[in-house]
């Protein structure tokens, strides 16, 4: 019944990466000119720019902004929310740090920032990779269908600029942002028609999202 978003204002054009040094997975510096790398990247992805959050913001901040937007759009009292579900992957990471902060969970931080006092408004996180928000929607729908909830707030948020390896050319893919949706019980027909979920962990699939070392072996790998 309502949706909201937070799109950062700090725009990074592809040209931002012209002076960056890129390395491969073996730590060898790429010999291609950066303009060639950028042009090929653009031809494959179509990406010309990405948005990064400002230094004074964090993932829970942009999640809250998106949530406020969705609440206003739905015109509901936030105290009537039964669940707040936040899908993310890396929690809060202050600018200049690589330390992941997930305790208290981001959903609790969002609830606090929204000044919701109702203890029956249950707030929890899910770490589910890229489709985390979709899985959050599936869970919210299940709560409503089971009669366990009437109103749910589902948020997807990440500040990937805080965790990317700037020496990896794939870092140009990632950006920051948050989106939020209000789901409400209704007597009318409609809603999510069908869905399915899956988790693949065979061979090395469990490590597809792995916070590893920098491609540049000359930098301090102890700092995350």
Where are these regions (language model features)?
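Flexible, glycine-rich active-site loops centered on histidine and acidic residues
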Residues: 145-178
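Short acidic, glycine/serine/threonine-rich loops at helix termini
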Residues: 11-13, 96-98, 137-138, 163-168, ...
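Acidic, glycine-rich active-site loops and adjacent beta-strand->loop/helix elements
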Residues: 4, 87-92, 127-132, 156-161, ...
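Beta-strand segments within the central parallel beta-sheet cores of soluble alpha/beta enzyme folds
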Residues: 41, 79-86, 121-125, 150-157, ...
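Conserved catalytic cysteine-centered active-site region
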Residues: 34-60, 93-151
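Condensing-enzyme catalytic core mediating Claisen C-C bond formation in acyl metabolism
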Residues: 1-56, 168-224
